[in-house]
């Protein structure tokens, strides 16, 4: 009887958060978050989209649990009402692993302590939407970690992912009115992927969360750590990243999601026992356009005329947006319009500003998008 050929699973995940054990580097950020968890210091974690923020949070939750801290991750993506936020909070507690905190949570539910929210997938008895009813339920939900801490004596870490949505719902005052009383029993990570909205929440003196959390910015991955990660996984599956590795690293320039996408495609084009060379790289590069086209074209089409000019100029390495090159080559207007557009693009997470004052440098968050822009919005390899 012929033996079945074993089909290997591609080791590079690009379309969802990485499992905690597969996180790429982030040792410095993990150390900061672990220290703040020990010291009960709240954190506002901000990063552009696709920089691995959720993967980092999942690893932080896993590490906290291993250290004896009760920890939950609340996903607020797509939440539009107080009732929906309450449902997501209860859903996070439903995912608690077996242990004292889980037992305390089950006890609350058995003795009428359930908040009674209908989550998107079902699971409780009463549907709550917008308005005062939703806010009353949310108040109870927000107090859950402290109630569990009182029952168990165990400290609790709560990580809110996509926390910027509370700004749209104008719920930041309500949230702070509850959690400010939790003392040293509970601490929080407020994570968001819209830099401008996160700044509005935590840096605007008029907002309730002003000064309530220590900042932590998530940047690109170090080249050496990323190279080691890719090489290790190629070797573990009987392949060699070869000279294509350098081309990949040059292209993605530390962008976490783009690195995983191109590594995934390069691995697919590399036969077992083979080295990834030019043919494999060209195949991976060609395939990538099918994954990126919709995102790139939608991003470009969303820009105003001035914003498009700013993106064009910055992608080409121009920093003086109102200088001769900005005006004559990229059609940027005189005055403050170009700088205001750049500020908006930084807030939206399309541009990032490094340094300050005269030394400040603008660059595109996504280096692969930048290459596409420089190529005249064509998908082509550049020399």
Language model segments and positions:
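C-terminal leucine-rich, beta-strand-based interaction scaffolds used for sensing/assembly
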Residues: 2-10, 290-383
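Amphipathic alpha-helical "lid/sensor" segments that cap RecA-like P-loop NTPase cores
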Residues: 231-295
